Amino acid sequence: MTTSTLTIPAADVPNTPGGGPSCRADHTHIAAALGAYTQSRSGFAVLPGPARHALLEIGDRLAGLRDALGPAESASGRDPGPHRTSESLVAPVLHDAVYPQLDMLGREIGFAAPATWRAASRYFHDRFGALVDLSPVAARCFHKPLGYAGDFEMMNMIYRNESLGDTLFGRSLSRVLLDSQAGQAVRHRAHYLAGKITAAAAHGTPHRPARILSVAAGPAMELQLILRHDPALLRAGRAELTLLDQDAGALRHARERIEALAAQAGAAMTLRCTNTSIRKVIAEGLTGPYDLIYSAGLFDYLKDRTARAAGARLVAALAPGGTAVIGNFGTANPSRPMLELILDWPLHHRSASDLRRLFGDFGTGMTIEQEATGINLFAAISA
């Protein structure tokens, strides 16, 4: 009996399981993908049944609208004028398609379970993230390229109020987010704070200017508004302004914009920038005294204990008769489910009674104020 042997060149040997480094690398990637899938599914499984249905319904409605708009957009061309008109037609339809389901999610999950919202948001973006990313506004919120929510460029997007996106669906989703009551509240609070700054500057003189500090300043849009529309008090040298932020990029951006606007307005003003964190402020305090200290959105991210410690430092740095203004989104924010699920932008919402509990014993007195929508509250504390 004759036995023949067939020799196969090494290059022709199939890459069978366990057969080499590339296969092991493939196994590693596959295992990671399966682990992510399992984690995502387990997060979905903890949701109440109606919440699971609402989440999937939101994704399905977004996908359906995106698919329906594609052919219509191709037929309409790329002229900006029709685009603006088209967004005004599409955005209300998109809003009405998803907001009832978002409201249902809010009722089913509640807001005492942040881990459940994180699980829901993770699953939603695993399934439907490609749709959400068609809106640059939503994409920046969710992906957080600077490592945290509400960075200065994100706030600029809200302040500029432009429907960004390469597709009609993406621009319409941006419009829905920007027109949300939370988006409106952010823009209104800039005007509210501009009023506080103007009032403080009115009591300053060139010899003793009002000293004003913005904590977590971001783009400092409230100062930009004053310089664009009512620069007279700043032109007279009645205010010294200090911007404090943990993000050096935010401070550079704010300084460039404010100095350019001040030059256009002929405003003689002193502007200082301090690059530090709220942790350091809590640990070391602030170098005062200031006639007005305000923080627009920082306290939305602070737990109660940290918020109270930070508030104490702000009030301690006030001059006699000065005011500290602490902003916080109120619990009656109808945009909260959208923030939690689609944008992964959780905040510590607080009621007026919550603010009184945290800061009511500071200074000589406190009032609770609000911007025009009534969604963003402010604790105004007198020294």
Regions found by a protein language model. Name each.
Residues 2-108, 180-184, 188-200, 206, ...:
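Class I (Rossmann-like) S-adenosyl-L-methionine-dependent methyltransferase catalytic domain
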Residues 92-204:
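Conserved Class I S-adenosyl-L-methionine-dependent methyltransferase catalytic core
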Residues 134-136, 293, 333-338:
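Short acidic (Asp/Glu) and glycine-rich catalytic loops that position anionic groups and cofactors
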Residues 213-216:
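Conserved S-adenosyl-L-methionine
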Residues 283-293:
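A short acidic, Gly/Pro-enriched loop at the edge of an enzyme's catalytic core
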Residues 295-298:
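A short beta-strand submotif of the Rossmann-like class I SAM-dependent methyltransferase core
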Residues 300-302:
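A short His-aromatic
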Residues 308-323:
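A short glycine-rich, Lys/Arg-flanked "PGG" loop and its adjoining helix->strand segment in the class I
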